[in-house]
Swiss-Prot record:
A GO cellular component entry from the record: extracellular region
Domain of life from the UniProt record: Eukaryota
Protein name: U8-lycotoxin-Ls1m
Propeptide: 21-26
């Protein structure tokens, strides 16, 4: 009986460890993907950059994208 309980506990620990490891290995977001609701999920060479959207001086929203680190984007006219 003790062996069955011990075996059950060991199996439970192994399954918990596997689930925790799978949780930590989420796929990262590639370049130009939206990261508004997941700012920490961009791939390691990217950063989540956010931009406010304005209409008549009032902010109407916010967009965030995974972009290259250290790159400055400028608006073209």
């Amino acid at each position: 009986m003790k062996l069955m309980i011990f075996t059950g506990l060991v199996l439970f620990a192994i399954v918990s460890l596997i689930e925790a490891q799978a949780e930590n290995e989420k796929p990262c977001l590639p370049e130009y993907k939206v990261c508004t609701h997941a700012p920490g999920n961009c791939c390691s060479d990217l950063v989540c950059d956010c931009y406010g959207r304005y209409k008549s001086g009032a902010q109407i929203g916010r967009n965030c994208f995974c972009l290259q680190k250290g790159v400055i984007y400028k608006r073209e006219n």
